[in-house]
Amino acid sequence: MASIEQALAEIKRGIDELIPEEELIAKLKENRPLRIKLGADPTAPDIHLGHTVILNKLRTFQELGHDVTFLIGDFTGMVGDPTGKNTTRPPLTREDVLANAETYKEQVFKILDPAKTKIEFNSTWLSELGAEGMIRLASNQTVARMLERDDFKKRYNGGRPIAIHEFMYPLLQGYDSVAMETDVELGGTDQKFNLLMGRELQKSHGQKPQVVLTMPLLVGLDGVKKMSKSAHNYIGVSEVPTEMFGKIMSISDDLMWNYFECLSFRPLEEIEQFKQDMANGKNPRDVKILLAKEIIARFHSEADADAAEQEFINRFQKGAMPEEMPELEFEAGIAISNLLKDAGLVNSTSDAMRMIRQGGAKIDGNKIEDTKLIPAAGTAVYQVGKRKFARITLK
């Protein structure tokens, strides 16, 4: 059993805020398993590495002997979290939410211990509130308090509409903590308002308020925005090992340390040694390979990580093409920009032309020079960037 000092050090590793720390210490001194909650609305079918930053911390609480619940917001998912949005999020159907929830359950157990994880659905208690319960819940807060939220404030000041149900979202999430009598709730920094709402509602219901622990948001592959599907800068935990490896190797050397801090389980002393080694001339690529292999081994296997490393070396350091790639057929006479888009190698024809101008598109290893090229009939390997290949036959 870890001492309180050791447990606190593990809990605080890589966090953004602990609100308030002294209350967590007091709860730890009670020498009982604490009730730890992480909630997630299943608004998309897949989990990416950005989500795993908080899941890793949840795993830490499991290893320290606490009771962990992964709460699936099947009810709140149909309301739609307005956090960070400048327009109203379209609500999902119950069918969408439940389908996504099944995928979530499969993916979270790549990190959490299934034997030590309780899965709950917040429709269990929120569906029972009814109209009277909803009105009573809404009476706990004022419109002025809700407008303290940065995203609501910006929309209000900008004359953009805010739907009434969006004001309810923080209250519903906060009520989850009341229903579960949560001791500690985890979330990203963008969830701070909602998490603190849980503290307020617990106090008003005569409960001890939960401690709020926020984790930093993982920066996406572009090095600018937070990792998200909408920004197309994410790495999915279910992606094939070679794709994951290539994406991790593509991040900047500076961003690599953010990934080590948020995603790695290595001792902090070892990560500091990596920094010192690089300062003394070690190639950043070699350190990045260690990061990529650690992450891939976690979500796939060590054998997959080794194979992905070898594939990367063959493809990018030796100039070899991958052994496997999509094989497609199209009618001859198609313009190169349309062909690359239809083959899934780029998102749009404008992306295709941009890649051609930058020298990032090739046919059988030869750079495409003409943005208006009509490729000749026959079979060839088309490449865009370093990772996207397709063997295409034009008939």
From Swiss-Prot:
Compartments where found: Cytoplasm
A cellular component term, taken from the record's GO annotations: cytosol
Gene Ontology molecular function: any one: tyrosine-tRNA ligase activity
Pfam families given in the database record: tRNA-synt_1b
Enzymatic reactions: tRNA(Tyr) + L-tyrosine + ATP = L-tyrosyl-tRNA(Tyr) + AMP + diphosphate + H(+)
Keywords: Aminoacyl-tRNA synthetase, ATP-binding, Cytoplasm, Ligase, Nucleotide-binding, Protein biosynthesis, RNA-binding
A single BP term in Gene Ontology: tyrosyl-tRNA aminoacylation
Motif 'KMSKS' region positions after renumbering to this chain: 226-230
SUPFAM superfamilies: Alpha-L RNA-binding motif, Nucleotidylyl transferase
Residues engaged in binding ATP: 229
Entry EC no(s): 6.1.1.1
Alphabetical list of CDD domains matching this protein: S4, TyrRS_core
Top class in the EC scheme: ligase
UniProt cross-references to PROSITE patterns, sorted A to Z: AA_TRNA_LIGASE_I (PS00178), S4 (PS50889)
NCBIfam families: tyrS
Subunit structure: Homodimer.
The protein's role, per its UniProt record: Catalyzes the attachment of tyrosine to tRNA(Tyr) in a two-step reaction: tyrosine is first activated by ATP to form Tyr-AMP and then transferred to the acceptor end of tRNA(Tyr).
Listed name of the protein: Tyrosine--tRNA ligase
